[in-house]
């Protein structure tokens, strides 16, 4: 029994050692630390106290990384302000669609919007290339305008202002400069540049020329202000002031007058508008040089004509200029007019020689000058012209010109815009001309004429083309439906004096032949003595007098027939004779309808 009790008490001595170890704190702490340091289940070597501190530190970091209520509210306010500004910008953009065009610009740089440009409404910025035309409706802020690209199908959007474009250019140059500096720090660039210095070799010249180009482009403004409607100017086939050139250009002016009735203003410009270069007008020191030179026009007169052209273009009607002094597109390349250059081209020099010789000795003696001017125009690259009319038939050339101008009209008058009122446009054009120097307006057909000297009328004032319909014994502005025999090719109802009644003696009026000319007269020498049908001969042919009386009865009928398609201008023999060669004589049909009245 004692042994059993002794055996049952056997485990007590080790159990008695456990309390001794429990009451000894230092061995217990050291052992527990070692145990916690080397025998953690996760295999880490950090102690329990450090792990607890890490847990507490992590909870503090997670607490501080959370945005505060003030930060959240500030971000919401910014988003609300952005949405409100975008809503207002869209509303202003919608209102601008019905507003008139304030002014127009031609771009000298290109622009492709990027997300970092801070457009008022993302995705509504206008992309354009150099030499594009923009209609500006209004200013949105200092960085953005509201307008549209003058192109069919383009809508109103945001256009960067010159200030914005300059800032974008400076930012781009700064980025390029930083890229160059970073690339120059590389070992290859430094060693190559050092090798150039040591060996004494010179770098090629293109970098220097590139720097010069960069300096020259820095001073070019991003936009040039131009007329809201680009004026139409005819050049060729030779020099203005000579019969062949004037007759062909006059045929086109008369076609435009009737084809675009109510949508076009045609005006005579006698001042030398080639002097209206931006470098001249903006530099007062050059004014004295121009004034002292033997120029035809003074700078004040030129400036007045330019302002009048801008005023005409504000009505958004087509504007055609009969400019006496413009014979080459380079004359207007540095002006602010940005015209639509129409080149009347005669491909064969022999055809031009034949036309000049057919006008008589007075024109034949200036043959070399006219041929030289024609060759100079032919040497110009096609990019200098907007339209090249090289058709042999007048009808085809007119339709070619009409197609281009119809497309331009659609580009400048988008469908979203309120359709123009022709009567209102005519009134606006008349009001614009009222402030111009010595204008002549025509409300029956917006054929607007101006000159420098007053007419020798009883009133002493400029008058409309239709105010004196019986002065020359013919009603101007008609296309007769029936022509007497021998007049089937007649295209003109307006004489040169009626059309440009402000001309002075000795001007381009002398180009046009007398009423006695006929189709057969094209093959005769006009320098011969006056026939019985000429005013100097003391009489008027009965057929001519009767034809104008009959034409008055057909005025209403022909107002709806403005197209020249009914009157084909072909140079053919009278009396049903054989048609001459197409290359030479169908082209001469330009002159047949012009000279015969």
Curated annotation (Swiss-Prot):
Lineage: Eukaryota, Metazoa, Chordata, Craniata, Vertebrata
Gene: Cacnb1
Compositional bias segments (type: Acidic residues): 548-558
GO terms, molecular function: calcium channel regulator activity; high voltage-gated calcium channel activity; identical protein binding; phosphoprotein binding; protein domain specific binding; protein kinase binding; voltage-gated calcium channel activity
PROSITE patterns: SH3
GO CC annotations on file: glutamatergic synapse; postsynapse; presynapse; sarcoplasmic reticulum; T-tubule; voltage-gated calcium channel complex
UniProt keyword annotations, A-Z: Calcium, Calcium channel, Calcium transport, Cell membrane, Ion channel, Ion transport, Membrane, Phosphoprotein, SH3 domain, Transport, Voltage-gated channel
Topological category with respect to the lipid bilayer: Peripheral membrane protein
Record protein name field: Voltage-dependent L-type calcium channel subunit beta-1
All residue ranges annotated as the SH3 domain in the record: 100-169
